[in-house]
Regions:
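Catalytic beta-strand/loop cores that center a nucleophilic Ser/Cys/Thr
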Residues: 1-59
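Extracellular ligand-binding/catalytic regions of CAZymes and related secreted enzymes
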Residues: 36-53, 57-131
Length: 131
């Protein structure tokens, strides 16, 4: 229910974090980032599409994570606002708690949760070619 107001192909111009480790065994991926043209700007951004919004439900709790919203204008986006409102409703226990891990189904096959993105980032930091 947290993504009910976000359409497929939703686009936002924002700064984003390059994650190097994921908790793939507990993540329920809700949205993937497509770095688009950024892939060609620096080797460290030449990564597969990867999770930027996810949730989990450890025990009786609920966790929602969103890596977006660095730019002020993103917070003015109606879909972004609706998503956060829905997410806060969900995290306080309302609605279905379906947050089963879905890494195998949702993440690109070439995104390794432990070493894939980390290898690219480490190579860029050390001025080495990414492999």
């Amino acid at each position: 229910p947290t993504m009910a107001h976000v359409k497929d192909g939703w686009q936002v111009n924002d700064e984003w974090y390059l994650f190097t480790r994921f908790q793939d065994q507990s993540m329920h991926i809700l949205a993937l980032l497509d770095p688009g043209a950024e892939r060609t700007l620096q080797d460290k951004y030449n990564v597969p599409n990867y999770p930027v919004i996810w949730c989990s439900a450890p025990g009786k709790g609920r966790v929602f994570y969103n890596a977006m919203g660095h730019r002020e204008d993103v917070w003015e986006n109606a879909e972004f606002q609706a998503m956060f409102s829905d997410a806060m409703t969900w995290t306080k226990g309302e609605g279905e708690a379906d947050a089963a891990p879905n890494w195998a189904e949702a993440a690109p096959a070439d995104l390794d949760p432990v070493s894939g993105a980390a290898r690219v980032a480490a190579a860029a930091e050390n001025n080495l070619p990414a492999k």
